[in-house]
Structures are given as C-alpha cells and as structure tokens.
Amino acid sequence: NGERSRADDYRAQGSLLMEYEILKGLSISVSGMLDFTQGNLNQFRPSTLDPQFNENYSKGGMLRKISLLTEELLRYNTSIREKHNIELLLGLSVSKDQEFSMQGSGRRSGSDYVYYYPVQVEGGIHNYGTATSPRYRPLTTYESNFKEKTMVSYFGRIGYNYKRRYLVEFTYRQDGSSTFGENHRWAKFPSIALGWAFSEESFIKKWTERWLSWGKVRASYGTSGQIFDDAYLAHGIVKMEGGSFNGVTLAEPGENIAPELTWEKTKQYDIGLDMDMFDNRVGLKFDYYYKYTDGLLYSVSLPGDIYYNSTQMQNALEVSNEGIEFDVQADIFRESAVKWRTKFNVSRNWNRFEKSANGRDIGNLIQGRPVNAFNVYVDDGYFQNEDEVPRYYNMQGDEKYLSNDRLITISAKTGYSNLVGTPKIMDLNGDGVINNKDRMFYGTSLPMAHGGWANEISWKNFDLNVLFNITLSRQMRNNNAWTLTQGNPVFVDLRGVSFWSKEGDNTTYGRIGTYAESLRSQIEKVNSVSLKQITLGYNLPKQFVKKIRLSEARVFVTGENIFYWSNYSGGNPEVISVYTGVDDGGQYPLPQKWTIGLTLNF
C-alpha cells in the first residue's frame, strides 16, 4: 500500500579500569563507563491512504541516551594469624544520565516517492476550510526534549570474620540525586549482616560429619532507596502545549512543583539458611524476608482552587512485602558417564497496602489488604424474571427496583426493570444501590507459589538443558470472556458458549447487550505448568577443534515456550500481568521460538 517505516538502533559501550597496589593488601582503583544509545525512526504514508485530504505524510524522530559512570575505590584486606580476617572498602561514585529526543512531521510533500520530507512548504500552514470559514492546520511540526539527572554516592564497608566461621559486615552509603528538591536530595542507607558457619563447630561436626558438608545461618537488616524516573518531577514541569496567542506559543505548568518529594525508602529484614550435604551432592537454601516501603509516589488531590493543577505528586503511600524462598540442587548422577544435575526453586510472596497519606482507602487499594487484591461484586446466576429483582421503598413510600449506582431508580409500578437476564448482584448492605460499598475482598492476583525446575544432563560431548515454570493457585479475572455480551467482543472460540434468552435458561453468560465487570464468578483459581526452554548442544571433538586453531566449538539448538498446561478458561496465563491478574484480551501471546547457534572460542 506504499506505507513505509524504518527504525535504526545504535549502541556503543565502553569501560576502563585502572588498579594500583599501594601496599600489601592496600589498593586503589579507578573505573569509568560509557553507554551510548540512539534510535532513529522514519515513517511515511502516501497520499493514497488519506481519503479525507489526499495528503502524504512523513514523520521522523530521534532518541539519544548517554550514561556516564565513574567509580573510585580504596580497598584494604588483611589477615591476622590466619584467624582474624578484615576487609575495608571506601568508595565514591558519580553518574550522569542524559536523554535528548526530537521529532518532526510534514504534509503535502511534492511526491509520494520521496519518503523524507524535503523542505518546509512556504507559509507552514494550510487552510482546509473556506475563505469565510477558515480551518487552518500546520503542514510541519517539530518538538524536542532534553532531560538530565545526576547522582553522587559515598559508601563504605567493613567486614570481619573469625576463621570464616563467625561473620559480620557493616555497610553505609549516602546518596544524593538531582531529581529531588534542594533540601531532600541526600539520604543515608546503613545495613548490617551476620553469619555463622555452624558446620565448622566441633560440637556439631560430631553429629553431622557423615552427611553435612557445609552449613551457615545468616541474618541481615538494611535500608535502600529508590528515585523516580522523571528528572524534573520535584521541580515542576513547563509544557509548550498551551495553544498560542498572537502567533506565539504559550507555556503552561505540566505538574505542580513538589519540592518536598524525597526518596522512596525500604527497610528490609532477611533470615537465611544454606546447607550442602552428602559430599556436596545436595544443596539447600532457604530465605525469609520482610520489606517495608514508605514514601511511594501518588498523585494527591489538592484543596481549593489556588493551584493551576488540582493534583500534586507526593510521597503518600506505604506498602509491605513478606515472602519465603526455597532452593534445592542435587547431583543425581555425578561420577557416571551420564551426568544429571537438577535444580528446583519455589517462592511465595505476600504484600499489603499499609497506609495512605490521609488514612483512607484509594480505589482498590484497601488498607490492610493485599496491593494486588480483587474487590468484586458477589453474583449468583441471572435474574430469571421480574419477581426475582429486589424491590425497595423510598422515603415517600414509592416502590423502586434495585439500582445500579443510583438513588433515583426505575419505578416498580411499570413492572419492567431491564435487569432480567443480567447478573444477579448481591446488595450486601441492603441500601437498594449497587456500588463500591457492595464489593468484597476475594483473593489476590499473586500466586500461592511460583517456582521452576531446571535439569542439566550431559553425556560425552552432548548436553541437554530443560527448564519448567510452575505456578500454583493464582487468582485471575477473565474479563475478556465477558466482552462476548457486548457488540464489539474480542472474538474467541464460541463452541460451548451460550447466552441467556428466556426464563429458566442455565447459560454461560447473561443476555446479549449487557456487561458486568468485577464479578466473583469471573475469578478463576489458575494452576499452570510450562516448558519454557530446552537446549540441546554438542561440543565438537577437541582434536578437530585444535586443527582449526580454536579452543572450543559448540553447536546448539534452543526452543522457547514449547508448551504449557493450565486449567484457565482463557489463553496462556503467563502473559497476564501478575500485578493486576486481569485478562482483557489485549495481551500478545508468547511466541514459540527456535534458535540454532554456533559458539566459537579462540
């Protein structure tokens, strides 16, 4: 059809490291890193694809990003009598990120065969109306944007262990970022970690030496910070999008200035256990963590009319996360010709919305409930006739039907509620109105457990790697299926699907033309297993590799997203966001991908 689009991406990375040993155990290092990326885009649409104005259209854009990082480290390591091991570290880090973008467009070029807009048409605007009723539109547009942010960090670490049996480490860092207001740029983040290699204790060895190779318990506490992506959110943003006056473009505030914005801070506690057993054939790892994050950004409504915008970004929310992680690794066959190592991990996370700035719930964020919660209406089939539709009486004694988020309802005297064939939603508080007060908590989109199973098998020059993903008891809402009752559904397999049409029907969905969302009946408890990746490789014989002056050569074939099994009524649940758990039919399915490769080492 003549439409063209071209994208070119470029990237260059470079790093430099210099290290010098001043004294035995004392060294200094200086490093630098540069990361440059640029993307160019050009799009062209010929005049034949513009039925209204018969104009061709060309658009071009460029996005350039530059990241610079320099880091200076002073290290000191020493051991006293091979018992007391000490490690000291002091560091300074400076980073700068720049982003520059520009784009422009042009219309009414001289030819549909020139894909780039050559020169600006004289005048720059065109009247698409008449002399008496003009309607002007620019023939060319241009916009550009520049962002820059800088961060400076000072940090230090002190580590000590006795015979590598008792371990303690203290870390402290102070970070400053240009993204915050002048009085809130700096933040302090201390942390401490403790460890005990209990397997080295003589009183434990005599009970465990036959099966325990190594074991350690560990605990830590630390704080960390997060900056927001927008470089100027705290300083206020001015947009050149306010229209024009007398031919001059106007500027307007994009966001209210927020000089009190500061770091999102997280306090985290960890307890862990590491064990290797049976001559290091089996390894176990267990972790428990608790994280509390405050100062999360949220757009807060402002009182009165004195502000240009009615909202302001503030550090307004607090959220907690708690979880466990378990890993096991085992060498099933280690000394035989066939070697097989298997790894299994499983994790569980709980989160909770702890607090808002004003102490109130925010939409689906209910204090004390999970962040990823489903707050739904309770439904029980469909209204089969008018007698099933609840009736209420107002203050004047008039009989009314059940209302949908309205106090003014259809009079019951007409005998027609327009609710027959629609979901029978429970009025939980009995006020005659279906609204958010009738919602109930019905689980979370976070799975009860999520894990993976990896296998590494080798025989002679062949190797096989297989990875499975497993998800258990994940709540999901199949919103996509309910679009079938609307006039513009996302088309799915209609076999076995039925719609309510008359009294007594026991159908999959209500009558055509109705739609209800956030219903309990839409929630499904989903389990799934997927073969995510399988790789078969072959290492060429060493004699042959040496003849062609290589140190190693390997050919392999890899498959991704091979298959999945799930009890979900929709498509592959892996593409549904774990944060929302809502399937709206807009997710692109995971492609099955096969790769053939060759690895050469010189």
Predicted regions and their residues:
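Surface-exposed loop/turn segments flanking beta-strands in extracellular/periplasmic regions
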Residues: N1, Q43-S58, F100-T141, A234-I257, ...
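Outer-membrane beta-barrel signature, preferentially recognizing the C-terminal barrel domain
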Residues: E3, A12, T132-S153, G243-G283, ...
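Outer-membrane beta-barrel transmembrane domain signature of Gram-negative proteins
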Residues: R6, R11, Q52-R165, Y221, ...
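Small-side-chain secondary-structure face that scaffolds active or pore-lining regions
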Residues: D8-R11, L17-G110, S178-R185, Y290-G323, ...
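Short loop/turn motifs that connect adjacent beta-strands in outer-membrane beta-barrel proteins
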Residues: L23-G25, S79-I86, R165, S199-G215, ...
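Conserved small-residue
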Residues: M102-V114, D331-G443, N567
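Extracytoplasmic gating/loop element in the C-terminal half of outer-membrane beta-barrel translocons
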Residues: S177, S417-N418, T471-E560
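C-terminal beta-signal and terminal closure region of outer-membrane beta-barrel proteins
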Residues: A316-N321, N364-E388, D493-R495, G504-D505, ...
